[in-house]
Swiss-Prot record:
Protein name: Lactoylglutathione lyase
In-chain residues carrying the UniProt-annotated modification Phosphothreonine: T107
Origin species: Mus musculus (Mouse)
Gene3D superfamilies: 2,3-Dihydroxybiphenyl 1,2-Dioxygenase, domain 1
Pathway(s) served: Secondary metabolite metabolism; methylglyoxal degradation; (R)-lactate from methylglyoxal: step 1/2
Domain VOC per the UniProt entry, residue ranges: 31-177
Gene symbol of the encoding locus: Glo1
Amino acid sequence: MAEPQPASSGLTDETAFSCCSDPDPSTKDFLLQQTMLRIKDPKKSLDFYTRVLGLTLLQKLDFPAMKFSLYFLAYEDKNDIPKDKSEKTAWTFSRKATLELTHNWGTEDDETQSYHNGNSDPRGFGHIGIAVPDVYSACKRFEELGVKFVKKPDDGKMKGLAFIQDPDGYWIEILNPNKIATII
């Protein structure tokens, strides 16, 4: 368990856990299914998330009346994706931890269009995290692919983890779950 923190640093472990309730039995089958990011250019974003990070496009849904499309990605085998549209939709929405990319049509051609990544004022959303077997090997590959870094593994005080940016400037933490305990 972490060392007790001074009052000015936030909640102590004890206080944090005392603020939490045991899950209601009715939530037993709930799951965190998706995180959504708005994107400017689906061609750039789909290339980044599939080629650079290795995610698989599970499904694309278009909403012509509202002029937007949704792209659902996850770490899944593309051969497991059902062919039937209804079955595919139910399957997609039952996966754990999917990334939903929302594209509002026309933003890719608007030079003034950009999205706030939450890491500058006013702060809000921070990042998503990707677990990898070897942070240094992954980052070497990212460098070779020309990926923009916010933090390389040996920068700063927290050694062994990195932050990269996607085409819209969203931050992505690159971590190794087996080594994270030695970092924090």
